[in-house]
C-alpha cells in the first residue's frame, strides 16, 4: 500500500495524557483512537518504543487521530519516570494535556506531580477525564472527586473552575459495554479538547530567532553566521540583534543563503547562512542568537525544573549539593553555572527531579520554557527547562 500523503488542511495540535499510574491513561488513549483514528489496542500503545532526547532515553508511544476540526498527535508514556523526562526534555511537545483521574481513587501523588510539572514546563491548557465512573455508585462521591481535582488544578495556578471535566469509562468505550459512559464520553472529551485547548501559534508567525552554530568570514562580502531558523522569518535588509555571551548588539542582514542559493528570506525550519553588516569575524560566536530586536533578553540567573539522570542512564553515581558547578548546554553551547538547591533540600540524588536556582558565568539569550542539557565534561547528566515566571 502506498504511503498516504499527510494532508495539511486542518490545524495540528500536540497533546498527551497525564495522571497517576493505573488511572487509565493508556486505555483512554486506545479508546480515543477507536473513535477518531486508526484503532491501536492497549498493548500496542503500552509497548512504547525507546527514543533519545537530549542524550536521555525515554519510552513514549505516539498515536495520531483527528476530529472534524483538528489533527492531533498524542503522546502516552508507560512509566512515571518517562513522563518526568518527557515533560522536561520536551521530547514530545505538548500544546495541551488530558489529565486522567480515576473516580474511584481521586487525585493521587502522581496526579499532583504531573500537574506541577505541567505548570513548570508551561503546558498551556488541561482538560480532565474522570475515568472508571462505573466503579462509583454514589453521585455525591463523584461530585466530591471532581471538586477535589478542580481544587488541585487551581492550587497550581490552572483555572480549576473553568476546566472541562468529562466523566466516563475508557474500558466501557473499548468494550462497547455502556454507550453513555463509553463512546459518548469519549466524543464529549474530544469536543472539549477541540474547544478548550488553544491552537498553537505556528513557528513562522512568531518573532524571528536563529541560534548561531558557525561563523565564517567571506572575503569581500563580510561575515556570515549559520544556523537553523527556530522561528519566524528573516528578510534581507531587516535589522536583527545579536544576543547572549557578550553585550547585545544590532546589525542588518544583507543576504540570506540556503544550499548556496541566494534567497530574499529564510523561515522557521530553514538551515541558512545570514550575511551580517559591519560585524567582523571575531565580533560574533557560536552560542549567541540572531533575533528580532527586543524580542529576547540575555540572562545569567534563572529558576529551572531539572531531571537528573540515574547511574544506569549514564548519569552521575553520586548526589550533588548546593554550589554544584556543571555546564549548561543552551541551544549550541556549554556555559558553566552554579546551582543553588531549594531550602530544605540537602542534596539531589541521581534519578530525582528538582527545582533549582542557577547563575551562569556569562549571560545567555533566554526565555521561559527554553530547554537545556546539564553536562559534565561533555557527558549529559541531566536535562532542564527554564521555569515559567522565573526571569526578571
UniProtKB/Swiss-Prot annotation:
It is an enzyme of class 3 (hydrolase). It catalyses: GTP + H2O = GDP + phosphate + H(+). Pfam families: GTP_EFTU (PF00009), GTP_EFTU_D2 (PF03144), GTP_EFTU_D3 (PF03143). The keyword Membrane does not apply. It is found in: Cytoplasm. Mg(2+) binds at residue 26. Signal peptide: none annotated. Its main location: cytoplasm. Residues 19-26 are annotated as: G1. GTP binds at residues 19-26, 76-80, 131-134. GO terms for cellular component: cytosol. InterPro entries: EF-Tu_GTP-bd (IPR041709), EF-Tu_GTPase (IPR050055), EFTu-like_2 (IPR004161), EFTU_2 (IPR033720), G_TR_CS (IPR031157), P-loop_NTPase (IPR027417), Small_GTP-bd (IPR005225), T_Tr_GTP-bd_dom (IPR000795). Residues 10-201 form the tr-type G domain. Keywords: Cytoplasm, Elongation factor, GTP-binding, Hydrolase, Magnesium, Metal-binding, Nucleotide-binding, Protein biosynthesis. The keyword Repeat does not apply. Residues 169-171 are annotated as: G5. Its EC number is 3.6.5.3. Residues 55-59 are annotated as: G2. GO terms for molecular function: GTP binding; GTPase activity; guanosine tetraphosphate binding; translation elongation factor activity. Residues 76-79 are annotated as: G3. Residues 131-134 are annotated as: G4. It comes from the Bacteria. Monomer. Belongs to the TRAFAC class translation factor GTPase superfamily. Classic translation factor GTPase family. EF-Tu/EF-1A subfamily. GTP hydrolase that promotes the GTP-dependent binding of aminoacyl-tRNA to the A-site of ribosomes during protein biosynthesis. This is Elongation factor Tu 2. The gene is tuf2.
Amino acid at each position: 500500500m502506498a504511503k498516504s500523503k499527510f494532508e495539511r488542511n486542518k490545524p495540528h495540535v500536540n497533546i498527551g495524557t497525564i495522571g497517576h499510574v493505573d488511572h487509565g491513561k493508556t486505555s483512554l488513549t486506545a479508546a480515543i483512537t477507536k473513535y477518531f483514528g486508526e484503532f491501536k489496542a492497549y498493548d500496542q500503545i503500552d509497548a512504547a518504543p525507546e527514543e533519545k532526547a537530549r542524550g536521555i532515553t525515554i519510552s513514549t508511544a505516539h498515536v495520531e487521530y483527528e476530529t472534524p476540526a483538528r489533527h492531533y498527535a498524542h503522546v502516552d508514556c508507560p512509566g512515571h519516570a518517562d513522563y518526568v523526562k518527557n515533560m522536561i526534555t520536551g521530547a514530545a511537545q505538548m500544546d495541551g494535556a488530558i489529565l486522567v483521574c480515576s473516580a474511584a481513587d481521586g487525585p493521587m501523588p502522581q496526579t499532583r506531580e504531573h500537574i506541577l510539572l505541567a505548570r513548570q514546563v508551561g503546558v498551556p491548557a488541561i482538560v480532565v477525564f474522570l475515568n472508571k465512573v462505573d466503579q462509583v455508585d454514589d453521585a455525591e462521591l463523584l461530585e466530591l472527586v471532581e471538586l477535589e481535582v478542580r481544587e488541585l488544578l487551581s492550587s497550581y495556578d490552572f483555572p480549576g473552575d473553568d476546566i472541562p471535566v468529562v466523566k466516563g469509562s475508557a474500558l466501557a468505550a473499548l468494550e462497547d459495554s455502556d454507550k453513555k459512559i463509553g463512546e459518548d464520553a469519549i466524543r464529549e472529551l474530544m469536543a472539549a479538547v477541540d474547544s478548550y485547548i488553544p491552537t498553537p501559534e505556528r513557528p513562522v508567525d512568531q518573532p524571528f530567532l536563529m541560534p548561531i552554530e558557525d561563523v565564517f568570514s567571506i572575503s569581500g562580502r563580510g561575515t556570515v553566521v549559520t544556523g537553523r531558523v527556530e522561528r519566524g522569518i528573516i528578510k534581507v535588509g531587516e535589522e536583527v540583534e545579536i544576543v547572549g555571551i557578550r553585550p547585545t548588539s544590532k546589525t542588518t542582514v544583507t543576504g540570506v543563503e540556503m544550499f548556496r542559493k541566494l534567497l530574499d528570506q529564510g523561515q522557521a525550519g530553514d538551515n541558512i547562512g545570514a550575511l551580517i553588516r559591519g560585524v567582523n569575524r571575531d565580533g560574533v560566536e557560536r552560542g549567541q542568537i540572531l533575533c528580532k530586536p527586543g524580542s529576547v533578553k540575555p540572562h545569567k540567573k534563572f529558576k529551572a525544573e531539572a531531571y537528573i539522570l540515574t547511574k544506569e542512564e549514564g548519569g552521575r553515581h553520586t548526589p550533588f549539593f548546593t554550589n554544584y558547578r556543571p555546564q549548561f548546554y543552551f541551544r549550541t553551547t556549554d556555559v558553566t553555572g552554579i546551582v543553588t538547591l531549594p531550602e530544605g533540600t540537602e542534596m539531589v540524588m541521581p534519578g530525582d527531579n528538582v527545582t533549582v536556582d542557577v547563575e551562569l558565568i556569562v549571560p545567555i539569550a533566554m526565555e521561559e520554557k527554553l530547554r537545556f542539557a546539564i553536562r559534565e565534561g561533555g557527558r549529559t547528566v541531566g536535562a532542564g527547562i527554564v521555569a515559567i515566571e522565573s526571569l526578571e
